[in-house]
Amino acid sequence: MDSIKVLMVDDESRMRKLVKDFLTREGYMVLEAGDGEQALDIFMNDKNISLVILDVMMPKMDGWETLKEIRKFSQVPVIMLTAKADERDELQGFDLGVDEYITKPFSPKILVARVAAILRRTSDAASEEK
């Protein structure tokens, strides 16, 4: 099986490492970006990214702007992983096209399960379209 690529975007390197460690153990290949601009550079240059995990509060370009840019080009699944727990923020995420919204602190095992579930759904949908 080819490794499924996940792009993890967070300005906190500890958070990126935590998520990367858990996803790598499950066989995913994790690419990292420290802000939205870096994330877009990576995303636009790698057409094999299957899922993006995105923080909201980051320097240079926040998660909302990053998501808007990604949605101009792709319907890749996106999970927001953020400390912004307000209902208004969560609704904004769904309005912008987020597939999941997970607030910090979070359970890494639940995150891995949600990643797998989203990828299963998108894989099933792609199979049905053929």
Functional labels for PLM-detected ranges:
Residues 105-119:
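C-terminal output helix
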Residues 17-25:
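Charged docking surfaces used in two-component/phosphorelay signaling
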Residues 58:
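Receiver (REC) domain active-site loop signature in two-component systems and cognate sites
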Residues 46-53:
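Active-site beta3 strand of CheY-like receiver
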Residues 4-5, 117-130:
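Short, Lys/Arg-enriched segments at the junction into DNA-binding effector domains
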Residues 55, 82:
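Active-site residues of response regulator receiver
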Residues 32-41, 63:
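Helix N-cap/capping motif at the beta->alpha junctions
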